[in-house]
């Protein structure tokens, strides 16, 4: 079984000179979910939406083509795709000839689906940037914080008040790569219906990820599971928009099965 330590993270590697799908490094999701306490049927649906900013190949005549792309990896795939391996794989297309852009899109979708173990959708282009976004930020709350990890779900609670539907946001989410220790920065959005979540507690909880080492996808699943357990909303959506690294950014989303108004798809200003 592949582990993060077996990947190319934190290692010097030569950039590929030709197309090589074996560069893609799948990591089983099961181990990370067991660490969160997720066993059996998942309490969420969702996807990992990747934005690729540095995509290039050669046309049939050898002339370079450039594009951007959006990749959708379903969260029920057996494996996630490690980010550095995805970067190296996409770079392996740089000197490869294709008869059409559609042939490139199909090849990427096929290779990613094979490694993830589920159908991965690929489309050219990126969602628009939204400088404002949805919801109400909790970052200006006047709170004292001295806990930066590990994530502490005890901060989360819901007030004994009538149910509301609201969207809360924070740009203060930071965690760290579990292999290299590099910081991962993100804006996070919570959309829910239920008793009002205590905002100061939510902010303290999100900041308690600051020294935590975990992959992006696992952080979002941990947030979803902790909020669901501690606050018991009727339904919940959690999405994190991580900043770009190596020409890629990732946007994991986890959602209850029945959500009447899904979140808009956009890129954060920091992306």
Swiss-Prot record:
Belongs to the GTP cyclohydrolase I family. QueF type 2 subfamily. It comes from the Bacteria. GO terms for biological process: queuosine biosynthetic process; tRNA modification. The gene is queF. Homodimer. PANTHER family: NADPH-DEPENDENT 7-CYANO-7-DEAZAGUANINE REDUCTASE. Catalyzes the NADPH-dependent reduction of 7-cyano-7-deazaguanine (preQ0) to 7-aminomethyl-7-deazaguanine (preQ1). HAMAP family: QueF_type2. Keywords: Cytoplasm, NADP, Oxidoreductase, Queuosine biosynthesis. It comes from Xanthomonas euvesicatoria pv. vesicatoria (strain 85-10) (Xanthomonas campestris pv. vesicatoria). It is found in: Cytoplasm. This is NADPH-dependent 7-cyano-7-deazaguanine reductase. NADPH binds at residues 83-84, 245-246. It catalyses: 7-aminomethyl-7-carbaguanine + 2 NADP(+) = 7-cyano-7-deazaguanine + 2 NADPH + 3 H(+). It holds the Pfam family QueF. Its EC number is 1.7.1.13.
